[in-house]
Amino acid sequence: MSTNQIILTDQGDNYVNVWSHVAQDLYNHYGETLYNSWFSKVNFIESSLNTVILCAPTNFVRDWIKSKYSMVILQLFQHYNNTIKSIEIITKELPGTTQTVIELPTKTFADIGSSELNSENIFSTLDVRFTFDNFVVGAPNELAYAAARAVAESSGAVSESNPLFLYGGVGLGKTHLMHAIGWYIKQNNPSRKVIYMSAEKFMYQFVKALRNKEVISFKEKFRSVDVLMIDDIQFICGKDSTQEEFFHTFNTLIDNNRQMVISCDRSPSDLDNIEDRIKSRLGWGLVADVHSTTYELRLGILESKIEQMNVKIPKDVIDFLASKIVSNVRELEGALNKVIAHSNFTLKEITLENTQNILRDLLRSNERIITVEDIQKKVASRYNIKLSDMSSSRRLREVARPRQIAMYLSKALTPKSLADIGKKFGKKDHTTVMHAIKKVEELLENDIELREEINLLMKILQN
């Protein structure tokens, strides 16, 4: 906990002391990895009517703690002070509270001697953006994150996760975690020798060593390290000579209790054109899958990135990005950067409409942008009514029901507000749209045929 801050306020000193005990208990119970991920930046704000108010750094962290740990935190508070009846977690400081920040000592890169940095370091191959502090943790990457932290924090000893094998699709955070391991070790254990390298570069260096008759030097370089991290191991599939050298390097390091971290786009068992003896060894330690992102994780990543960049983005834009850019984290962050850059260069305000226009090509490559007009045309055609009936006030069932379905689909498939949807349907107000959506939802509970019909319409529109 030496790297954390304790936040004090000018009110409720007794509760401040209790919070310091609770924080220590959370650290002791969950360990450093989980503590740093979720609790280290949660601050005590104040107490009011036997309610303790805590402040989380982002909405994502707040919601995660509420869903996973709120009861544990409350019980710990009550253990020290039974007058506490509830806790509240917010994301903004309350007016009238002044905070005193007590900084506890923390080691930074500036504290590391220049000779330490210059002696066979890997800083030139590590991306400064990829640290544990700015890696957003969620259900899809929890295991991989915890395992990577354990490797980094092993303080010279080999972790139980040896080798650590991280696998998953492109842009989901595998490389980020490997860089974070490198930064952490070099910051906290600078005497340890670490090499991070792509499998492609490993192969090219091996080929160069063969050509220049420097194989012995090559072997000494890679077999004398404390931690060897090889990214995208799938690259050596089908390359027999490189596989042979990797196999012997792997064995030497593992036999000498040195740590290996390997990433891949698939699990060891799914690798083709690679020797079985290598495949089996890759699964010796911990195999951690980095899953595709969830909406909640994408929201957390965006909030974290926006906080780092110190910019203001409207909530509807953040929700839109989290909903529409679903392929990987790299593309999500790229989309956010593009929106911010466009605003900076054109001096235009960031709005949902501007965002949709800026990202039109990217969104089209992921999924076509569905408009209310698209929905109206498709539903009108499906039910054999005139397109003009969508904006009319006709109450005949054969017209009103398709119109209600179109409103329901407009809410489900577009980011438009109820008021905006209403305007597209003959300037109807938002309560009319709300009634239509509620009516369709009620019908869907029991009408299997309608449910299938709407599912079919959704597929047609999305494809």
From Swiss-Prot:
Keywords: ATP-binding, Cytoplasm, DNA replication, DNA-binding, Lipid-binding, Nucleotide-binding. It holds the Pfam family Bac_DnaA_C. Residues 1-83 are annotated as: Domain I, interacts with DnaA modulators. Residues 83-124 are annotated as: Domain II. InterPro entries: AAA+_ATPase, Chromosome_initiator_DnaA, Chromosome_initiator_DnaA-like, Chromosome_initiator_DnaA_CS, DnaA_C, DnaA_dom, DnaA_N_dom, DnaA_N_sf. Residues 344-463 are annotated as: Domain IV, binds dsDNA. ATP binds at residues 171, 173-175. The keyword Endoplasmic reticulum does not apply. It is found in: Cytoplasm. The keyword Transmembrane helix does not apply. It comes from the Bacteria. Residues 125-343 are annotated as: Domain III, AAA+ region. One of its GO terms (molecular function) is DNA replication origin binding. PANTHER family: CHROMOSOMAL REPLICATION INITIATOR PROTEIN DNAA. Oligomerizes as a right-handed, spiral filament on DNA at oriC. Belongs to the DnaA family. Plays an essential role in the initiation and regulation of chromosomal replication. ATP-DnaA binds to the origin of replication (oriC) to initiate formation of the DNA replication initiation complex once per cell cycle. Binds the DnaA box (a 9 base pair repeat at the origin) and separates the double-stranded (ds)DNA. Forms a right-handed helical filament on oriC DNA; dsDNA binds to the exterior of the filament while single-stranded (ss)DNA is stabiized in the filament's interior. This is Chromosomal replication initiator protein DnaA. It comes from Rickettsia felis (strain ATCC VR-1525 / URRWXCal2) (Rickettsia azadi).
